[in-house]
C-alpha cells in the first residue's frame, strides 16, 4: 500500500535520526576519534545506496534507496556533534520527509494508470498528463537539492560541517551528490519523456492527487523562504 510507503519514508525512517540525536547527548564528543569509523561508515553507506539507485529499474525501490542514502548524510552530520551539523541533519530530515513522500505519491499515481513500476514501461506521460509531469519535475529538483530549496540549505550545512571536520570527505559528498542528480534526472526522463505506449487508455489526474502534491510541496517552499523556523 502506498500510504505505508509514504509514512515509512516521511516519518518512520526519520525516527532513527531522532534516536541518534538523543543518544549523542549521553555520549562523549568526537574529539576522542571514537566515532570516526561510524562517520566513514555512514558516508560510505550513503554512496553505496546512491550507486544502488543507479541500477534500479523499479520505481518504488529507487525512491526507497534514495531515502536511505539521504539518511546516511543525516547520521554522519549528527555524529560530528556540532550546531551546524545538527541543524543540517534536522533540516534534511524535514525536507526529505516531504520530498520522498511526494515521490512515493507520484509513483502510485503512475502505477494506478500503467499497473507497472518498471521505469521504461511508464514513459511518455508528458504528453498525456502535463500537470503530473510538472509535479514530477518539482519533486525531482527538490530531491537533487537545487537552490533555494530547503534540501539545498540542509545539504549545504551538512557539507560545511563535514568539510570543516575533515576536508577529504568532500570527495565522497561530491560523488554522492553527483550520483543523486544522475538518478533523479534518469527517473524523471524515464517516466515522463519518450514515446507514449500504444493502446494505453490513461485516465486523467484527479483533483485529490493535485491537492496531495500541493500539501507536500507548499510547506517545503514556504519553509525554504523562512528557514529560521527550523534551523
Swiss-Prot record:
Matching Pfam families: Proton_antipo_M
EC number: 7.1.1.2
Keyword tags: Electron transport, Membrane, Mitochondrion, NAD, Respiratory chain, Translocase, Transmembrane, Transmembrane helix, Transport, Ubiquinone
BP terms from Gene Ontology: ATP synthesis coupled electron transport; electron transport coupled proton transport
Places the protein is found: Mitochondrion membrane
Catalytic reactions on record: a ubiquinone + NADH + 5 H(+)(in) = a ubiquinol + NAD(+) + 4 H(+)(out)
Family classification: Belongs to the complex I subunit 4 family.
UniProt name for this protein: NADH-ubiquinone oxidoreductase chain 4
Gene: MT-ND4
Amino acid at each position: 500500500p502506498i500510504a505505508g510507503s509514504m509514512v515509512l519514508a516521511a516519518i518512520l525512517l526519520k525516527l532513527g535520526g531522532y534516536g541518534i540525536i538523543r543518544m549523542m547527548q549521553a555520549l562523549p564528543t568526537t574529539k576522542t576519534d571514537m566515532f570516526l569509523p561510524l562517520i566513514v561508515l555512514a558516508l560510505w553507506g550513503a554512496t553505496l545506496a546512491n550507486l544502488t539507485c543507479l541500477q534500479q529499474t523499479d520505481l518504488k525501490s529507487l525512491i526507497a534507496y534514495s531515502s536511505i542514502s539521504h539518511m546516511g548524510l543525516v547520521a554522519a552530520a549528527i555524529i560530528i556533534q556540532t550546531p551546524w551539523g545538527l541543524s543540517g541533519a534536522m533540516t534534511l530530515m524535514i525536507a526529505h520527509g516531504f520530498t520522498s513522500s511526494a515521490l512515493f505519491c507520484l509513483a502510485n499515481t503512475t502505477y494506478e494508470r500503467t499497473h507497472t513500476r518498471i521505469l521504461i514501461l511508464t514513459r511518455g506521460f508528458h504528453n498525456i498528463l502535463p500537470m503530473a509531469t510538472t509535479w514530477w519535475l518539482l519533486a525531482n529538483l527538490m530531491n537533487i537539492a537545487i537552490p533555494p530549496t530547503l534540501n539545498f540549505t540542509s545539504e549545504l550545512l551538512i557539507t560545511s560541517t563535514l568539510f570543516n571536520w575533515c576536508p577529504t570527505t568532500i570527495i565522497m559528498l561530491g560523488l554522492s551528490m553527483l550520483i543523486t542528480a544522475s538518478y533523479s534526472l534518469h527517473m524523471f526522463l524515464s517516466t515522463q519523456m519518450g514515446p507514449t505506449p500504444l493502446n494505453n487508455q490513461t485516465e486523467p489526474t484527479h483533483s485529490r492527487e493535485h491537492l496531495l502534491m500541493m500539501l507536500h510541496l507548499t510547506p517545503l517552499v514556504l519553509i525554504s523562504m523562512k528557514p529560521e523556523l527550523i534551523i
